[in-house]
């Protein structure tokens, strides 16, 4: 293993070199069921032809632009999600930490608007919600929080 990667996780000494659907293959060809999906960030399966084709098509058109501008495909996805979820609008995040940070901010804003003086965010023991200061504060694991005090 290399020390060039910051030791944020206790990495297992397994090298995955490719995937097929729900399976990961290591450098020796051994198959493992992918029960984590990139810590549930990309649960799309591996080497999914439809996903790969869609990504390729989009990357040949436009990879990314700022949310300072309108993004038609993002707007269409938001409309579709609004219709099937019953929610009023959507927030697109770049990571789980950013999504959790936004959820905390929305909860606080809601509490503020309702006149809650001292809002409390409830989290589970041994949980992990991200590496930002707010999500680290919400993480129910003192070991992960150690060294980052004072938390928010």
Stretches with model-predicted labels:
Residues 1-89:
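N-terminal glycine-rich, Lys/His-bearing helix-loop that initiates the first secondary-structure elements
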Residues 79-152:
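PLP-dependent aspartate aminotransferase-fold enzymes
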């Amino acid at each position: 293993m290399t020390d060039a990667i910051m030791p944020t996780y206790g990495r297992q000494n397994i090298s995955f070199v490719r995937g097929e659907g729900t399976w990961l293959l290591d450098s020796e060809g051994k198959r493992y069921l992918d029960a984590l999906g990139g810590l549930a960030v990309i649960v799309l399966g591996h080497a999914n032809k439809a996903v790969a084709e869609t990504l390729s098509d989009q990357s040949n058109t436009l990879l990314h632009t700022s949310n300072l501008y309108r993004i038609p495909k993002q707007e269409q996805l938001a409309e579709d999600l609004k219709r099937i979820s019953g929610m009023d609008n959507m927030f697109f995040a770049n990571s789980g930490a950013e999504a959790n940070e936004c959820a905390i901010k929305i909860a606080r804003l809601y509490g503020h608007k309702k006149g809650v003086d001292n809002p409390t965010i409830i989290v589970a023991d041994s949980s992990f919600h991200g590496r930002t200061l707010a999500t680290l504060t919400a993480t129910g694991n003192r070991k992960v929080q150690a060294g980052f005090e004072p938390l928010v």
